[in-house]
Amino acid sequence: MKATEYRRYDAVGLAALIANREISAPEALEAAIRQTEALNPALNAVVHTTYDRARRLAQAALPATPLAGVPFMLKDLGQLWEGVPTTSGSRALLDFIAPLTTTLTSRYLGGGLVILGKTSTPEFGMASVTEPAVYGPTNNPWAPGITAGGSSGGSASVVAAGVVPAAHASDGGGSIRIPSSACGLVGLKPTRGRNPVGPVMSEGWYGLAASHVVTRTVRDSAAFLDLSHGPEAGDPYAAPPPDGPYRQAAQGPHRSLRIGVVEGAMTGDVNLDPECLVAVDRTASLLEELGHRVEPVSTGIGPGPGRRAMLTLSAVDTAWMVGTFDIDVSKLEPANQVVVEAGKAVSATDFADNLYLVRHYGRIMGRIMEDHDVLVTSTLATPPWPHFALQPGAEQRERIAALLEGRYTGSAFQLMEEIATKSMNRIPNTWPFNMTGQPAMSLPIHRAESGHPVGVQFVGRFGREDTLFNLAAQLEEARPWIQDYPFMDPGTTQWAEADRRAQSGRPE
């Protein structure tokens, strides 16, 4: 199977070819392996390959499932496959081999997916870009030297480049939607509790995080959620069960929806790039053309307390993880050593206050959603940006060093907040819905003048992924994007120069 033919198909289409015996699962896998070997030197997106295991999976009898035989990759964070390395983007875990297989991975394998590798992530997923010190930055297939987003940047890069039609991703503050916007993909963060996180963990980041996939088509995202959703024994909570298959919801019929449009930043403290404003405006016009009732809406979510709550919960969880699993803190990236110190400094009452605020935001949005079926926002505040743009500056790096050497007299938490500001200013519309637990999806329905993708975010009521799939399929039909592939020739001087810059280290 040639690369040009392989890339034409989404996961559902490729699975149909395999089911109809037009191609075999081993043929599809070998096409994916060739794509990986040809493109990953330029993408720097795949950090571990499992070709031998994948060949055994492809050659075995496939289950009679809608995605059987499809090549697939796991994000190198959260999801374990027994006997396979999981580094979580950290030098501290380079020797870690998974002792078990997590429930979600088991569901993927049970559905006949052929897992051939693991994709890059920032250390512990603690960034909106994918630039782990241990592996270097992951390139965006649309342009060398531009971020693929994070923390699921490796997965987004390989899907956008046509290495695999879909890849696992996870989202604690936007980490499915950010790279989907940057790389021109469909990226759904499901409802809190929709997909399992066990058997070891009960929730991620105290309910902020969720797992799903990044894909090129709406029907693929729906098909994967049909495969993976549902609680497991011992879950602390579960999402409301769907009325039927998500693939069926995506196929229509379409109904007129009440849609609220947030024209700027949810938090009101960030000015969006003009390209992002245009994307939302054009989307609102398209929705009206399609017969939906569209009106502007203000959410009333302010910047400061929400950001602090997000950072508090993620820092405390990181500090807990490092201590519980006896991770060598000295091997962490300096900024994440600050996160650990900040998390350790949070008092029990401060933690409880911030957890309460997260739940309170859910109440606020729940009332807003009583009058709307869907909210629309820009996914990001800007089009995708160059590598290292969010790294701490020289003065911040000096204070980080002082903290780690015991010379710093200030607050570790305040230093962490300051370091995070650049990133949080790029994602004012993603993290609020990690707090509320609502399903939120980025769709690739706009291109900047530069040619870079600009995603638009669609947010549903709690538990109503079906509404999002139905609307997304309608938009995909009205403004199809499946034919859009990033121009990428890894043999060009442009890519070689980008790779040289990426490997040379952080800018001054």
Give names to the regions the model predicted.
Residues 414-435:
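Alpha-helix-centered segments that form part of catalytic cores
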Residues 100-232, 434, 438-446, 450-455:
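Short glycine/serine-rich loop segments
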Residues 22-30, 59, 245, 274-298, ...:
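Acyltransferase
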Residues 67-90, 248-262, 313-366, 379-415, ...:
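Short helix-loop capping/hinge segments that flank enzyme active sites or metal/cofactor-binding pockets
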